[in-house]
Amino acid sequence: MDTLSLKFRKLKSSDKWVSIFAAVITFLTYASVYAFRKPFTVGSYNHASLIFGLPYKDALIISQVLGYMLSKFYGIKLISELKNLGRGKLILLLVGLSWLSLLLFAITPAPYNVVFLFTNAFPLGMIWGIIFTFVEGRRATDFIGASLAVSFIFSSGFVKSVAEYLKVNYAVTDWWIPFLTGLVFIIPLIVFVFLLEQIPPPSKADIDSRITRLPMNKPERKKFFAEFRYGLVVLIILYVFLTVFRDIRDNFAADIWRELGLGNEPSVFTATEIPITILVLVMIAAMILIRNNRRALVVTHFIIVAGFAVAGISSWMFIHHQLSPFLWMTLVGLGLYMGYIPFNCIIFERLIATFKKGGNVGFLMYVSDSFGYLGSVCVIISKSLYSNKLPWATAYSHGVMYLSVLGVAGTFIALRYFNKKYRREFTANAETQNIPVFDNELMLNIKTANA
């Protein structure tokens, strides 16, 4: 008995260290990838000409977001059908193509170099899905996925600080900042991708808890979506809201800080994102303690509701001069990421595990992302064309405030739908299997479904 107990403790310890290793490596890998994505946003490009009536920087952002959007639509097929072989090489190939685009952006005169932000974004848009396939379908996926997801909160601010440092201390021009920032991170990225491929596959206990995750062909994708269509449509709409406002904050953070009088402080980008990263990581990683997938799905909806509330209330206080600019940017970021991060690591993972349906998170995530970036493109173009004189800080604070009301209502609608569907399916399964109504476990699950 003592020998068996010792083996069990070793197994648990091994699982724990695999989870920690996977969390650290996925965090560092995706953080390094961000160095090829966001550094261009620190540039002001003040002397560049308008492009089709748009400010040059707005045109750059639109070009990149268009690349992400089309990448996500293409990724619905690529990521959902992805096999396990050669994933590390694929990551490096995609990043290499993206980095080459940044070199072409630097050496091609404006405005013709705008197209290279599109070619920079298209390969990068598929990397999150590839990385997530290494950690999906595990009992610790909530913890590992949280680490992966919050990496872009921290890294977005960190790589901008690195880019701003290069700009201020080495007089790097706006056009060369993206390529040289990528150069700083290229060696670490290669190392992290190698370590990423050393992550062991899910254990038998993982599979028993979260079911096996398999590639999905087109008929399987259609069948899965049709079965949950109403709840998924609501979740996708919510995700569009969150993506739009998270993306505006991410892309125009430098402009917002300049309007708020803090544009010449490189550390400000990291100062707001570090506490957000820590708080969201702790909150989301704690979901690993909830073993019941059904209960975790419900709790995730309430986290999203809380995120919308934090973002909305902090914006209302900022508009009415009850909150400092720095605290507002921190709290609105915290609220948006409380809503945004669960989509990237928990809600679809627990949805699949709750209903025991074959599939993978990549499919659902890329459907959501494709429409999210489509929404970002539309908002950025509309703002640039019709209200360009309105400061970003003003437009953003008011937009987030109204968003929060819709977000809270929509999240409760989605929760109600999944509650009802679970209750119907569980009752049908119980009747099919002739489970007696006095079965204690059955009654506990029914209470959970009605919670």
What does each model-identified segment do?
Residues 112-127, 322-340:
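Hydrophobic core of transmembrane alpha-helices in multi-pass small-molecule transporters
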Residues 141-168, 184-185, 365-379:
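Glycine-rich segments within core transmembrane alpha-helices of 12-TM secondary carriers
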Residues 40, 125-140, 253, 338-356:
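Intracellular juxtamembrane helix-capping segments at the cytosolic ends
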Residues 1-17, 167-236, 259, 290-292, ...:
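Intracellular loop-helix junctions on the cytosolic face of multi-pass helical membrane proteins
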Residues 265-292, 307:
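Transmembrane alpha-helices of Major Facilitator/SLC transporters
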Residues 94-109, 288, 304-320:
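C-terminal ends and interior cores of transmembrane alpha-helices
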Residues 38, 230-262:
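Extracytoplasmic gate region of multi-pass secondary transporters
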Residues 58-79, 275-283:
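Central cavity-lining transmembrane alpha-helices of secondary-active solute carriers
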